[in-house]
């Protein structure tokens, strides 16, 4: 192995296997672009993004880590969301949950 060298496997990488996913349509009704990162709690995104928020509690974008989806003003996009894993506590973002997720879902 050489310093800095990557040795990669040829097999497919499966992400989020066994986790609940949904698809929703979200619309940017604002006058500025909004970018949402891969691990941002989608329920708490900018209020200019319109969608059924309640169904997205405890979910984030189902995209590779470190990437994002950008909504230009007026954009309507279908996005795939996936449940958070682990102990399912969420703090910060827009401080709408600040606690255990599973007590909030319908």
Swiss-Prot record:
Pfam families: Urease_beta. Its main location: cytoplasm. It comes from the Bacteria. Pathway: Nitrogen metabolism; urea degradation; CO(2) and NH(3) from urea (urease route): step 1/1. One of its GO terms (cellular component) is urease complex. Transmembrane segments: none annotated. It catalyses: urea + 2 H2O + H(+) = hydrogencarbonate + 2 NH4(+). Gene3D superfamilies: Urease, beta subunit (2.10.150.10). InterPro entries: Urease_beta-like (IPR002019), Urease_betasu_sf (IPR036461), Urease_subunit (IPR050069). GO terms for biological process: urea catabolic process. One of its GO terms (molecular function) is urease activity. Belongs to the urease beta subunit family. This is Urease subunit beta. It comes from Lachnoclostridium phytofermentans (strain ATCC 700394 / DSM 18823 / ISDg). The gene is ureB.
């Amino acid at each position: 192995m050489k310093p800095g060298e990557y040795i990669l496997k040829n097999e497919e990488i499966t992400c989020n296997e066994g986790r609940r996913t949904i698809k929703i349509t979200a619309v940017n009704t604002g006058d500025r672009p909004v970018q949402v990162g891969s691990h941002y709690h989608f329920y708490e995104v900018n209020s200019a993004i319109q969608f059924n928020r309640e169904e997205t509690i405890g979910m984030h974008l189902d995209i590779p880590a470190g990437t994002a989806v950008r909504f230009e003003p007026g954009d309507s996009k279908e996005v795939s969301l996936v449940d958070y894993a682990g102990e399912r506590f969420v703090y910060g973002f827009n401080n709408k949950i600040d606690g255990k997720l599973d007590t909030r879902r319908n």
